Structure formats: C-alpha cells, structure tokens
Regions:
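Charged DNA-binding/catalytic regions of mobile-element recombinases
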Residues: 1-154
Length: 154
C-alpha cells in the first residue's frame, strides 16, 4: 500500500499529543561558545532493549567536559526519575547557566521546568526532530549501545 501511495481508511493513532501545559522553549545555543564547566548541560532519555521489554536511561551531561554528571535507569518513562537525576546533578555540581533538552514530555513537564526555574537556570530546547542540536548526548547513546549493548550479542 505504501509503495502505491494508498492510505488505510481507519484513523492513525496519535501517540504523541502534547499537553497544553507543556511549554516549548527556544533553542539558546545557536551562536554561543562553551568556555567553562557548568555553562551548558544537556539531558536525554534512551531505551535499553531487554529480552522482555525495555529499560529507560536518562543522563545529564556537561557540554564543556562531555562528562556524565548523573544518570538513572527506570522501567517507566515518568518524569520523576528525570527530576531525581536533575536533583542529583544539581546537588553535586551546582546549577548550570543553561540546560538544553529535546521536546520530550518529561522535559516539557511542569515538574521538570519548575525545578530548573527554581534553580535560576535558563531553559533551552532542541527544534522538533533536530537531534543534532543535542549531538553530544546522542553520541553518548550511540557509543553506549554499540559498545555495551549490541556488541556483546554479535
């Protein structure tokens, strides 16, 4: 059907409908030079495939040093495990000036953005579908999966 350009008559599922209270923030890193630690942090979530499901891994990384400041595993993608990771990183290293994430529901949620605002952090978000805006943590996921997850099974 796809090759012929045909569409089914049933409605397609809408799995990613943003909630009205989830605000999208502008991307602040377009023309900024990173010159010191704690200037810009980023966060992202990836999934780790298992024999019977997935685990979700969130990591927070400093853009200057490329160091993972905090990480957590969870069997659900709720916002609380992300907020706990943020609390750990801020508790150990102090708040950054700018925090960059994608537009995932965990990072646009009230709990996440409120925690950053309370710490006086400027919020930056990648453009929709622009994975290169958060390239350092995406590279971390690639290295982690190919070196530690996929490779042992080859």
């Amino acid at each position: 059907m796809r090759l012929m350009g045909l569409m089914p008559i049933y409605r397609q599922p809408r799995t990613s409908v943003p909630a009205k209270e989830h605000r999208i923030y502008p991307y602040l890193l377009r023309s900024i030079s990173i010159e010191r630690p704690n200037q810009v942090w980023c966060a992202d979530i990836t999934y780790i495939p298992l024999a019977k499901g997935f685990l979700y891994l969130v990591a927070i990384m400093d853009w200057w040093s490329r160091k993972v400041l905090a990480w957590r595993l969870s069997n659900t993608m709720d916002v609380q495990f992300c907020v706990d990771t943020l609390d750990e990183a801020v508790g150990r290293f102090g708040p950054p000036e700018i925090f960059n994430t994608d537009q995932g529901s965990q990072f646009t949620s009230w709990a996440w953005t409120q925690r950053l605002k309370e710490a006086g952090v400027r919020i930056s978000m990648d453009g929709r579908g622009r994975f290169l805006d958060n390239i350092f943590i995406e590279r971390l996921w690639r290295s982690l999966k190919y070196e530690c997850i996929y490779l042992p099974f080859v």
